[in-house]
Regions:
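HotDog/MaoC-like acyl-thioester-processing domains
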Residues: 16, 91-120
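Intrinsic-disorder/low-complexity, polar/charged segments enriched in Ser/Thr/Lys/Arg/Asp/Glu/Gln
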Residues: 17-21, 47, 85-87, 100
Length: 120
């Protein structure tokens, strides 16, 4: 299930050699938030992983699958009411076979998640 342009939209993206920054807008009216959790919407961790995967694929231009989640830390809840526009910062390294991704989800200095993932 693709979440882009439904659950979230990319408002701005900047890229340099290794760093890729995506400013997104969460859709607070999406049906996922009605279930997770009614009256207190929180972005599910699985959706955060999927958003990172979609951004990695958009950046690389390749259809990739998550091979390994080396480290996934959720440090604070991402709520569409309090943080409607989080920033995803991705550092992508390609060794020819795999894409090692270090990602942070944040809003200013507040860090919501840190992820170390490998895609093939």
């Amino acid at each position: 299930m693709t979440l882009k342009d439904n659950f979230y939209t990319i408002c701005n993206a900047t890229h340099d050699a290794d760093s890729h920054v995506f400013e997104v807008k969460l859709n607070a009216n999406h049906e996922i938030y009605a279930a997770h959790f009614p009256g207190n919407a929180i972005t599910p961790g699985a959706c955060t992983l999927q958003m990172v995967a979609e951004m990695v694929q958009e950046t690389t231009g390749k259809c990739l699958q998550l091979a390994c989640a080396k480290n996934v830390k959720y440090l604070a809840p991402i709520t569409p009411q309090n943080t409607p526009c989080p920033t995803f910062v991705l550092n992508i390294k390609n060794d020819g076979q795999e894409y090692a991704v270090k990602a942070e989800v944040k809003n200013g200095e507040q860090v919501f998640a840190k992820l170390s993932l490998v895609y093939e």
